[in-house]
Amino acid sequence: MHLRFTLMAAAAAILACGAPAQVIQFESNGLKYQTLSKTGLTVMFAHLPMQLRDYSAVQVGVSNGSNAACTVKPEDFSFRREDGTMNYALAAKDVVTQLLGRASRNDVSKLISTYEMSLSGIPRLHSTNGYEQRRQQALAEMSGTKLRAAAAASAIAFVSTKLEPGESTDGAVFFLTYGKPLGNGQLVVRTCGRIFEFESLPSSSGKTLEQR
């Protein structure tokens, strides 16, 4: 079953009850997910249990159940700390050049395995236009073990994506945290004319991947 069915099922449950939009929480494979739907668009996220030296990441899934196309991009995501200051997500190109470009091969392998493990924890988390599709395309265009590994890691980064009605996508959104967890606060998503807000209490057990 596709990601859009997973996310839209939550939206359908809310509509069936006639209740206003509310955050639904669930746990899978050790990750704590939150999902929220607004006028057909559904956003889901979970903190990934790893840090790549100076960066923290969240796994994101977005499904468009509305009647209109919309474009979602990593710059739509921000984190509001308890003191009110904002931490804005990195653009996909910055993730590749600043983060993945300096990571060791071992770090890249760990990043890939961490993200793929998070996907395997939710059998229904299968995007129509997400990580797996980007990975396959990148692997087809690259040759050499090191280049193919880097391409796969780059495919993890959430990229600007136009979602037609019924389409979905996923990826990792990265925040510069200087080696510290995101901490307590709110994940804020401003996209497609909607604002999604999630109370965020990440686990403190995240593993740090070294950059060289």
Where are these predicted regions, by residue range?
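Conserved functional micro-motifs across diverse proteins
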Residues: 21-212
